[in-house]
């Protein structure tokens, strides 16, 4: 970290969701280097220095670095969880759940295969329903007690393609999904470099396409896509895909494809993926508000 600009270092440490956000933190006087106030976004950060941010929202830091990723994606792709019943698939320490709560979610079902990982301030929130020891692949509306309005997911060491049938099956007809695609878990072992970092743009594009293609098989269409505000801790680039049910391609249980359904993404979806992954810019469907034919 020696010699890094303060705004760059704050972003790299997961204390800010973008360079602009980092600069704002510094300008507001909330950045600290080894406990001392730092006032210049361009100022150097000594090697080994401890970075902190004070006076964070609600008086407490987010439950994880990943929280900043979802926070940025909700802004970037213009999604609002206020008043919604949400599912956090792969909740871990609760970073995504934390963001949803702070943004006004009515209730969050936090599902993870592990146990006792949620940060205390997340676990103790009355709006959180903890489902430890639960596989995302096994989820059903009956298990959750209701269909959900919004699904968010941050999963590791598993392809989103393996859980999409379950996730598509638990959303309400008006529901939406915001899933973080991690190419290193989508390209397959044979295509993954020894470093574990997917650097080939074509491979990253194909990773996202694979997720969106599986989503289409479940009756979901790509509404928007954008890059994560932060890279993975290993340096992998990650992407958020916003999916919603298509009225002409309805979700169906257990991955069963409805006879006669169009089960592949349209040309616009592939164009959105190529532009967002290749150009690192958000893309939204042009016909977002146009009525669909049944």
Task: Describe the role of every protein-language-model region.
Residues 1-49, 85:
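A basic, amphipathic helix-loop patch mediating RNA/tRNA/ribosome contacts
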Residues 81-92:
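Conserved class I S-adenosyl-L-methionine
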Residues 94-95, 116:
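Glycine-rich SAM-binding Motif I of class I
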Residues 99-107:
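Conserved S-adenosyl-L-methionine
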Residues 106-165:
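S-adenosyl-L-methionine
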Residues 161-178:
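A short glycine-rich, Lys/Arg-flanked "PGG" loop and its adjoining helix->strand segment in the class I
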Residues 183-199:
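Short, glycine-/aromatic-enriched active-site segment of Class I SAM-dependent methyltransferases
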Residues 232-276:
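Core SAM-dependent methyltransferase catalytic element
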